[in-house]
């Protein structure tokens, strides 16, 4: 680690100590939420004080007791720790728990599962790395916020969002907000910032929450060694690339000619700069030597989006996003770009585009960032694409971010991120435009927000069997000049799930991707895997988090916002009922969304079990069932 970067375990300055304390609390709070939500610790074993928010949890194997000084229960069984945690032994002695490692070791013997032999230590290493990176990010966020406050004041803008709208093209304003919203990561991932293997200066140089600018190399891949997937309107790969990146295409072709090569024999293949120097040159040395892959070429500067490896060129005129593999472990997964994403991104983009073009109501409520083109290294004789997960690309059109209708695109995670002016979540700046922050106004705003998300999402699922992964990173809301939500903009279809009988019944087709060792995403027999994907992403990770935020920020009474969400979900079901395949199907799905427990991904358990199963889920109390 860089000597200038303080160690998490040995902070040397007051600022570092404050940042460490904040990072440690962040980690502990995420772990507490996951431990109880995933039933690794039984929430019904908590002993609550008659008044206030104190609670105790018995650790029977060790004959000890956890004491929470400020623990609150929100809808969906969400336990939020806002105070100190102590452990009491049999003598009554107390010891405060100040770091996540101490918490996990204290509860390890009481977990409802048996972790893998190295599961706990791997988890703690990733949590520690998350804390290090969280400290770096929040230190830089303080500096970035100070700069922005000065710029906003000098511009006389009423807020951060207004300042961005005035000072940048809409697509770059949207990307600034996307990077701004990358600070917190997934709302409850316990390894929310883990990037093991990256030095501190690399984390800062490559990560969106630092406002990074990252170069991409436009390398070359032998066309005979490439598989290309494209939407029907796209011509050849090279023609599309030349049309969308004319200067790069020209420089790339001239470079090949200067090296004695014919550009017609090659495809331009963007490669992330870090990935090229730290992985590709070493792991693909044989392909480079054999003339299959040429690592030389021109470069383009890009803005990494919230996903870290989907990049938007910094050009004044919008260019397509470039999604790439990066051989870095982040939030406990290596960020490859598998063949499934190359094949299914353009295919699902085509299917969804065809559906939306025929559905007037959907067209008014929904836009998508289409994945027009993808390519991957593929062995010309065996057809093997496995190695290509490290040499691949998907291009995603960015035109929907370049607005001319006055709407501002804001990635959902940015709405929940503290703004630079007053430190409140940015969603509060949008609500504040009305000048009315009464409870009735908050409920009205959330009703419109929920309708904006729920109507198109449920229509696409219930009528066509297509589930958007509409969590905070993939969902963008288009807001009007009054700060009101108007449309949903969805991205990332490579892993989208679908239920074939529904869209085929309505005359549509989708070629599924099937490959050994890769989880399928198109299903024929069981819609529950598609439904759980949608509920977890859209309802648990997105709408529930918005309701939690607004309830806390505006002291909204009880579960009234979940009651609003229930009403909007009920209304969506009633509207769609005449078009659904059967009343039995309508009733089954209505009960799944409104009455039965919600499925959610067990991210902490997966980590502890070393990812032996990527589809482990747990059940959350359905907050809509109790909000009648």
From Swiss-Prot:
Q: Which Pfam family would be a valid example here? A: FhuF
**By its UniProt entry, which InterPro entries does this protein fall under?**
Aerobactin_biosyn_IucA/IucC_N, IucA/IucC-like_C, LucA/IucC-like
Which keywords describe this protein according to UniProt?
Plasmid
Query: What domain of life is recorded for the organism?
Result: Bacteria
Task: List the source organism.
Answer: Sinorhizobium fredii (strain NBRC 101917 / NGR234)
Name recorded for this polypeptide? Uncharacterized protein y4xN
GO annotation terms (biological process): siderophore biosynthetic process
User: What is the similarity comment for this entry?
Assistant: Belongs to the IucA/IucC family.
Any GO MF annotation of the entry: acid-amino acid ligase activity
């Amino acid at each position: 680690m860089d000597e200038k970067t303080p160690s998490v375990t040995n902070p040397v300055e007051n600022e570092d100590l404050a940042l460490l304390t904040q990072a440690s609390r962040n980690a502990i709070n995420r772990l507490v939420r996951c431990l109880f939500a995933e039933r690794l610790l039984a929430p019904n074993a908590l002993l609550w004080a008659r008044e206030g928010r104190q609670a105790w949890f018995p650790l029977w194997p060790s004959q000890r007791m956890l004491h929470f000084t400020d623990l609150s229960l929100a809808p969906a069984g969400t336990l939020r720790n806002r105070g100190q945690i102590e452990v009491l032994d049999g003598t009554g002695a107390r010891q405060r728990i100040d770091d996540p490692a101490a918490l996990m070791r204290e509860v390890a013997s009481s977990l409802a599962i048996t972790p893998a032999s190295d599961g706990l230590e791997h988890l703690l290493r990733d949590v520690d790395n998350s804390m290090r990176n969280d400290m770096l990010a929040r230190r830089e966020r303080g500096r970035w916020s100070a700069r922005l406050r000065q710029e906003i004041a000098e511009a006389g803008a009423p807020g951060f969002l207004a300042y961005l709208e005035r000072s940048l093209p809409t697509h770059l304003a949207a990307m600034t907000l996307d990077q701004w919203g990358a600070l917190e990561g997934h709302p409850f991932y316990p390894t929310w910032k883990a990037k093991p293997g990256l030095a501190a200066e690399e984390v800062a140089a490559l990560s969106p929450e630092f406002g990074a600018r990252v170069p991409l190399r436009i390398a070359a891949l032998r066309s005979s060694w490439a598989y290309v997937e494209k939407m029907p309107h796209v011509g050849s790969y090279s023609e599309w690339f030349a049309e969308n990146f004319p200067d790069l295409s020209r420089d790339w072709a001239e470079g090949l000619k200067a090296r004695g090569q014919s550009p017609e024999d090659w495809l331009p293949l963007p490669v992330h700069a870090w990935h090229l120097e730290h992985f590709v040159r070493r792991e693909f040395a044989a392909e480079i030597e054999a003339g299959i892959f040429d690592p030389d070429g021109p470069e383009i500067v890009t803005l990494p989006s919230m996903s870290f490896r989907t990049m938007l060129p910094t050009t004044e005129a919008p260019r397509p996003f470039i999604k790439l593999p990066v051989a870095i472990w982040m939030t406990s997964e290596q960020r490859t770009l598998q063949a499934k994403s190359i094949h299914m991104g353009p295919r699902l983009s085509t299917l969804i585009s065809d559906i939306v073009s025929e559905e007037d109501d959907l067209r008014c409520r929904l836009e998508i960032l289409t994945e027009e083109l993808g390519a991957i290294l593929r062995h010309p004789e065996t057809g093997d694409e496995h190695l290509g997960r490290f040499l691949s690309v998907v291009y995603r059109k960015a035109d929907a971010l370049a607005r001319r209708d006055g709407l501002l695109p804001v990635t959902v995670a940015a709405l929940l991120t503290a703004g630079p002016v007053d430190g409140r979540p940015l969603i509060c700046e949008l609500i504040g435009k009305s000048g009315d922050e009464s409870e009735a106004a908050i409920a009205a705003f959330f009703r419109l927000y929920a309708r904006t998300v729920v109507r198109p999402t449920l229509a696409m699922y219930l009528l066509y069997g297509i589930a958007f992964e509409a969590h905070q990173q993939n969902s963008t809301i288009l807001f009007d000049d009054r700060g009101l939500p108007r449309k949903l903009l969805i991205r990332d279809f490579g892993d989208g799930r679908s239920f074939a009988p529904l869209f085929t019944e309505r005359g549509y087709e989708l070629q599924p991707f099937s490959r050994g060792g890769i989880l399928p995403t198109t299903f024929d027999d069981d819609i529950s895997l598609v439904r759980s994907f949608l509920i977890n992403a859209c309802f648990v990770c997105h709408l529930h988090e918005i309701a939690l935020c607004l309830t806390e920020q505006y002291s909204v009474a009880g579960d009234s916002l979940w009651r609003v969400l229930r009403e909007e979900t009920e209304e969506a079901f009633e509207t769609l009922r005449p078009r659904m395949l059967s009343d039995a199907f309508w009733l089954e799905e209505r009960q799944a969304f409104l009455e039965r427990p919600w499925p959610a991904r067990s991210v902490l358990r997966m980590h502890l079990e070393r990812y032996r199963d990527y589809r482990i889920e747990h059940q959350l109390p359905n907050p809509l069932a109790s909000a009648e």
